């Protein structure tokens, strides 16, 4: 340890605060908090604490500087640590998934007919609204929302649609919604359905079951058989839900149980959420390179996790976290009620901690097995494509254009086989006019590689969505910039990026390479080589679907590599390519709508660029602007009664421009004369959303000639 660090250790104050450990490059690698900065930080370098020697040795190697921030209280230190971790994202701190990944259900009880909405947990909580969650996955929240809306018949339409609908939607016809948007539905009756749904979401099904039984019996006695049947269906749905839930505690309390399992620097924190004594959800949170003590890791985790999640009455933890009392005060303040952190040593609650620990161990095993499969898939990609190394950092690029208009490019990133959305990029093609996919791709790859050279970081592999022509355009861009696409024999450590082209499978006409799904006379299915399709037909098999295989084009090779069907390497590359395609089409659709929106609003006198953007942000679609009242338009930023009246009058004059409906119609628009011509802005504006989306999606409607 150098003299500067030793001096800082000697001068540490015995006060609460946070400390930032930095490496020799000045990057923050760990943030911690302490009730006494002197005691906590010096403990890392105390030779008498043998249980911490592994990470102390690591500190001796990495630590270059130390910074401390003194706070007025321990509670303030807890809050500051949370903010510092989010700001610096240190290597050795626990970091949860981005908070935009956490999803909750929101119920705005200020509305006379509220609905359940899916919201990001990071959104600011609104007064008068109730929140349920967070949910561990999008599928779980969709299933919950589907069940609640189906059996408790809450409306699903947005407030804007609710205010402007003139006739009921299909959900009313199939008895899934009472249509309060159109018909007079008693607010008290709807409120009863809302309260039933709230009890179900909060895990108080026992009370709900008793009340539903009483109301069902009352409806039957009053000869209201249709109402009784509806209540019976609700009761059966709730009882089925109860059968799936495991009762772990008889006291019907709300608590979270935290389990922790570690092997070396890797660990998993398991959260078992119990509501009304029943297990409601289970989430496993894996973390790498966690060299610091478990009590510090647990404290940071709880502070971060409950920032966007309502803490229950009790949180059972396997060991006492650092500054447990201050942490409990922070969680209680966030919740508005008391939250207790307990570490039971015996009894039923201690048994729950053991269950959580065993679940954490199981989650750890599953996590590492997933890592092994991912490593095998990356190695398989390297072998199949003759790459110099496993592609840990892959990117894929795609071009999206409608007859040469509004051309855009997309780039998606994948690191270690997982999406890396922080490095997703969108490109507006600037230097190419007309329908020239190769030139567009050359421009996009040039801009990407130029930025990579400036940052000093090249991906391992760039996948081009397309065939040999698209790959050659990308290779030309790399050559123009002097970017190596193969390792240098004389300097194996020199940076380089490899490029390949991935061509989609297509429908084929007649015998060709690849496989076909064939069906026999007795319904038996089998994979057959397309070259043997005629023989298969003679034997009584009929081709169900014939497609060419996915083909990967490599630099300097005439024939493409055909990847094995259903292989891990094909799945990984196709997933990357499809994500790039989705990202490009989404961006193209956004630009299209903005352009159509702007072109129509340009005809309204007195509406400048700022007000156009405000209308677009507020309403999102021209149809919604047309349906809005002058009072609703006046609520948009920058609009007063005069501007709102002008917009409303423009859309309701006798010669108002037609506004395409959101519903898809028509077929893909084609260009006359065989080849696609560049579309004018007017043509793009006139085409329906469905027509353009279908053209961009490239659904392979026409067969590919036989090879």
UniProtKB/Swiss-Prot annotation:
Q: What keywords are assigned to this protein? A: Cytoplasm, DNA damage, DNA excision, DNA repair, Excision nuclease, SOS response
Compartment list: Cytoplasm
Gene Ontology CC terms, in alphabetical order: cytoplasm; excinuclease repair complex
Q: Provide the UVR domain boundaries.
A: 206-241
Q: Which Pfam families does the record match to this protein?
A: GIY-YIG, HHH_2, UVR, UvrC_RNaseH, UvrC_RNaseH_dom
Tell me which InterPro entries the record gives. DisA/LigA_HHH, GIY-YIG_endonuc, GIY-YIG_endonuc_sf, GIY-YIG_UvrC_Cho, Hlx-hairpin-Hlx_DNA-bd_motif, RuvA_2-like, UVR_dom, UVR_dom_sf
Where does this protein have compositionally biased stretches of type Low complexity? Answer: 660-670, 677-689
Gene Ontology biological process: nucleotide-excision repair; SOS response
Question: Which residues lie in Acidic residues bias regions?
Answer: 690-707
Q: Which coarse location class applies to the principal site listed for this UniProt protein?
A: cytoplasm
Q: How does it assemble?
A: Interacts with UvrB in an incision complex.
**The protein's name:** UvrABC system protein C
Source organism of the structure: Anaeromyxobacter dehalogenans (strain 2CP-1 / ATCC BAA-258)
Please state the gene responsible for encoding this protein.
uvrC
């Amino acid at each position: 340890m150098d003299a500067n660090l030793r001096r800082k250790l000697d001068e540490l104050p015995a006060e609460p605060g946070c400390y930032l450990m930095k490496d020799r490059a000045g990057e923050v690698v760990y943030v911690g908090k302490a009730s006494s900065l002197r005691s906590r930080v010096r403990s890392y370098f105390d030779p008498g604490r043998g249980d911490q020697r592994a990470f102390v040795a690591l500190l001796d190697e990495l630590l270059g500087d130390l910074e401390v921030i003194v706070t007025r209280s321990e509670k303030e230190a807890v809050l500051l640590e949370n903010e510092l971790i989010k700001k610096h994202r240190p290597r050795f701190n626990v970091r949860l998934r981005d908070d935009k990944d956490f999803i909750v259900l929101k119920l705005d009880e200020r509305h006379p007919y509220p609905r359940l909405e899916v919201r990001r947990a990071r959104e600011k909580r609104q007064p008068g609204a109730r929140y349920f969650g967070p949910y561990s996955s999008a599928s779980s929240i969709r299933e919950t929302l589907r069940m609640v809306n189906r059996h408790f018949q809450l409306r699903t339409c947005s407030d804007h649609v609710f205010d402007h609908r003139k006739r009921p939607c299909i959900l009313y016809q199939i008895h899934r919604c009472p249509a309060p948007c159109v018909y007079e539905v008693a607010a008290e009756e709807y409120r009863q359905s809302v309260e039933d749904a709230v009890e179900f979401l909060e895990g108080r099904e026992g009370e709900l079951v008793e009340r539903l039984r009483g109301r069902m019996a009352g409806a039957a006695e009053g000869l209201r058989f249709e109402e009784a049947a509806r209540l019976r269906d609700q009761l059966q749905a709730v009882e089925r839900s109860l059968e799936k839930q495991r009762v772990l505690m008889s006291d019907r309390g709300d608590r979270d149980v935290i389990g922790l399992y570690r092997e070396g620097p890797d660990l998993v924190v398991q959260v078992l959420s119990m509501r009304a004594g029943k297990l409601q959800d289970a989430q496993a949170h894996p973390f790498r390179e966690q060299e610091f003590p478990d009590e510090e890791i647990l404290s940071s985790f709880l502070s971060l996790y409950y920032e966007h999640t309502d803490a229950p009455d009790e949180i059972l933890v396997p060991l006492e976290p650092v500054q447990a009392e201050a942490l409990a005060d922070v969680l209680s303040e966030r919740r508005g009620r008391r939250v207790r952190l307990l570490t039971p040593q015996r009894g039923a609650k201690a048994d729950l901690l053991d269950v959580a620990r065993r679940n954490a161990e199981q989650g750890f095993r599953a996590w590492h097995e997933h890592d092994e499969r991912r490593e095998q898939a990356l190695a398989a990609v390297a072998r199949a494509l003759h790459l110099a190394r496993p592609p840990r950092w892959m990117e894929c690029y795609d071009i999206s254009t409608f007859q040469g208009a509004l051309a855009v490019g997309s780039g998606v990133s994948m690191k270690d086989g997982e999406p890396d959305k922080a490095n997703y990029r969108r490109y507006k093609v600037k230097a190419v006019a007309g329908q020239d996919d190769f030139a567009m791709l050359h421009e996009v790859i040039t801009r990407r590689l130029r930025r990579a050279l400036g940052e000093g970081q090249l991906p391992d592999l760039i996948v081009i969505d397309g065939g040999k022509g698209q790959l050659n355009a990308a290779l030309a861009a790399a050559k123009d910039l002097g970017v190596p696409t193969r390792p240098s024999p004389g300097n194996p450590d020199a940076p380089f990026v490899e490029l390949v082209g991935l061509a989609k499978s297509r429908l084929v006409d007649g015998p060709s390479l690849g496989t076909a799904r064939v069906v026999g006379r007795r319904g038996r299915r089998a994979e057959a080589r397309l070259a043997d399709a005629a023989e298969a037909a003679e034997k009584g098999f009929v081709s169900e679907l014939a497609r060419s295989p996915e083909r990967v084009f490599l630099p300097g090779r005439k024939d493409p590599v055909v990847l094995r069907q259903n292989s891990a390497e094909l799945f990984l590359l196709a997933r990357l390519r499809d994500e790039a395609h989705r990202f490009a089409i989404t961006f193209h659709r956004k630009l299209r709508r903005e352009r159509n929106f702007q072109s129509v609003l340009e005809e309204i006198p007195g509406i400048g660029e700022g007000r156009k953007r405000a209308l677009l942000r507020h309403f999102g679609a021209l149809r919604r602007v047309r349906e809005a009242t002058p009072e609703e338009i006046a609520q948009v930023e920058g609009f007063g009664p005069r501007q709102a009246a002008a917009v409303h009058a423009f859309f309701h004059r006798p010669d108002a421009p037609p506004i395409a409906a959101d519903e898809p119609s028509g077929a893909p628009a084609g260009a006359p004369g065989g080849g696609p011509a560049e579309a004018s802005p007017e043509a793009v504006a006139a085409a329906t959303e469905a027509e353009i989306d279908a053209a961009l999606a490239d659904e392979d409607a026409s067969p590919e000639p036989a090879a």
